[in-house]
């Protein structure tokens, strides 16, 4: 029964009058957004909509960063959100283009690195009998730099 139900739903989907086929169809919308971005970009790349060199993507990332700075100057939260999303999308495109490791794996590595450094800072502060709240941003930045050196 389940198999028949899935066949009927698939046929309805393929024959829906308002449904337009897209080369991007089939990218699951339930997976993490970073994975979605890479899958969308990969499908577009297969059709020739891709960069020829990774440096071009870095330039695009810089362009998106500049647009984010402009949006921040305007104070328009919706525009800031849009530009921040564009920046994240462009950055994910670089990991997709390089074909070494997925952006999801790279971000996971960065998360673990951040956590390790933050925990180092916590230990250093505890050894000094301090808490984060006791420090100004300059002191915290100095601790962060020390953590990066470890």
Residues covered by each model-derived region:
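Flexible "arm" and connector segments at domain edges
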Residues: 1-84, 89-150
